[in-house]
Design a protein with these regions (language model features):
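C-terminal motif of bacterial Sec signal peptides marking the signal peptidase cleavage site
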Residues: 17-20
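Bacterial N-terminal signal peptides that target proteins for export
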Residues: 1-8
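Hydrophobic helical h-region of N-terminal Sec-dependent signal peptides
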Residues: 11-13
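Low-complexity, intrinsically disordered segments exposed to solvent
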Residues: 22-270
């Protein structure tokens, strides 16, 4: 049981898909009179909330909270002809730096320099996160170094049903000092598949978010290595199902959790 706890402790929660940038530049895509890009980015975030932590807008590493980054504000991102996308100024908070780039595409897959409600068929959000955050909670200190790359595309914008697909990879290196000293390294890959957002439903009606993580940790003289496989399935309600299998050595441990994405209730697992 202790080894299972260790793997859970150092697993990395998915960083918010809406993590982005801030800038004083206002030459980016105008979402006010054409296409509501802020709303679409919000859809992309809602479609992945709870995939790892079960808490809307909050990430965690080793049980230590990672402050949620602000969402991308489309009007602050500047169009770059060289990449045919909108580059946002880097945003840094608590030692973590986020870089985001937005791409707009028509039905044929061609890049666009401005959003157009009549022709923009998809929005792509590429986010990179890197940095080291230090923490001190209840006498326990340490740091975590994070590196993450996420590439998500929301398509179907010319219809009433939008579909999110994409993937992300992340690497974390956690060091905790004090009475609960430990060192853990986790690598995670997450695949978002056909997460469907309907105009008539507040919550995604279908689709999955699948995560696979490998973890190695050291607590004192105890070394533990393991894997975690989880699948979150959307069904149109705020309460989604996440199945998880954690394996340390040859011993698997499985659980099924009901997660309320609205935050109205704590996750219930068995």
């Amino acid at each position: 049981m202790r080894s299972k706890h260790v793997v859970l402790l150092v697993s990395v929660a998915g960083l918010a898909v809406t993590a982005g940038c801030r800038s004083n530049d206002t030459t980016g895509p105008n979402s006010g009179n054409t296409l509501d890009l802020s709303s679409l980015i919000g859809e992309m975030g809602m479609a992945t909330l709870g995939a790892s932590s079960g808490v809307a807008g909050v990430g965690a590493v080793g049980g230590f909270a990672v402050p949620a980054m602000p969402p991308v504000v489309p009007s602050t991102c500047q169009y770059s002809a060289s990449i045919q996308g909108f580059t946002c100024a880097p945003f840094t908070s608590n030692g973590i730096t986020v870089n985001a780039t937005l791409f707009l595409l028509d039905a044929a897959g061609h890049f666009q320099s401005q959003p157009d409600a009549a022709t923009t068929a998809a929005i792509r959000n590429v986010t990179d996160v890197q940095g080291t955050m230090k923490f001190d909670q209840s006498g326990t200190g340490g740091s975590v170094t994070l590196t993450s790359h996420q590439d998500l595309t929301l398509s179907g914008l010319l219809t009433d049903t939008h579909v999110l697909n994409g993937s992300s990879t992340s690497h974390s290196d956690l060091t905790v000092t004090g009475t609960s000293a430990l060192h853990g390294v986790t690598d995670t890959k997450t695949v978002t598949a056909n997460v469907t957002v309907s105009k008539s439903s507040r919550w995604p009606t279908a689709g999955t978010v699948t995560s696979d993580a490998t973890t190695s940790s050291q607590i004192g003289s105890v070394s533990v290595a393991g894997t975690t496989h989880s699948v979150l399935t959307f069904n149109g309600s705020s309460v989604v199902t996440m199945t998880t299998t954690i394996t340390t050595g040859s011993t698997p441990f499985s659980s099924t959790c009901k997660i309320d994405l609205s935050g109205a209730a704590v996750p219930v697992c068995n």
